């Protein structure tokens, strides 16, 4: 049996941010795909079920895609340079469970990914340190 792969879809206007997120997610074992907008996710339910969506999109875009967002709310990670209590409450009401302030800290992204459950058959490699690598501060003890 061939194990399914984890996919990560990145939506962000900033090329540097997309590159940074792509490198982080590849390091965490994801096959990364950069997409232009939310509409490109339609018909990709199977891929998303076995992966995640990391996006910096306007709240109006999310409001226009509530039906899609509700299907993937547990695997949708919103990134934003401005995270206020008011915005967080509004997003939570829409079903967004994971919000990360930009610039994205790799340790926080990894922590959020660890909270996401992946379906059977989806290969989920360890997110721990690599052999011979230096441990993160939280891993030293």
Question: What label would you give each PLM region?
Answer:
Residues 42, 61-74:
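Short amphipathic alpha-helix used as the core "switch/output" element in two-component signaling
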Residues 34-52, 59-60:
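Acidic, metal-coordinating helix/loop segments flanking the phosphotransfer/catalytic sites
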Residues 11-12:
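Conserved acidic carboxylate
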Residues 80-98:
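Alpha4 helix (beta4-alpha4-beta5 surface) of REC/receiver domains from two-component response regulators
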Residues 20, 86, 104-113:
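C-terminal output helix
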Residues 119-141:
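CheY-like receiver
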Residues 15-33:
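Two-component/phosphorelay signaling modules centered on CheY-like receiver
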């Amino acid at each position: 049996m061939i194990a399914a792969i984890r996919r990560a879809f990145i939506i962000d206007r900033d090329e540097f941010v997309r590159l940074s997120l792509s490198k982080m997610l590849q390091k965490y074992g994801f096959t990364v795909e950069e997409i232009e907008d939310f509409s490109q996710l339609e018909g990709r339910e199977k891929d998303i079920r076995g992966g995640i969506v990391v996006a910096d999109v306007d709240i109006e875009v999310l409001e226009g895609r509530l039906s899609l967002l509700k299907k993937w709310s547990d695997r949708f990670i919103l990134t934003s340079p401005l995270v206020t209590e008011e915005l967080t409450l509004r997003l939570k009401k829409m079903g967004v469970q994971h919000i990360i302030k930009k610039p994205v800290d790799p340790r926080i992204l990894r922590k959020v990914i660890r909270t996401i459950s992946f379906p059977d058959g989806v290969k989920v490699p360890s997110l721990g340190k690599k052999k011979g690598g230096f441990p993160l501060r939280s891993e030293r003890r």
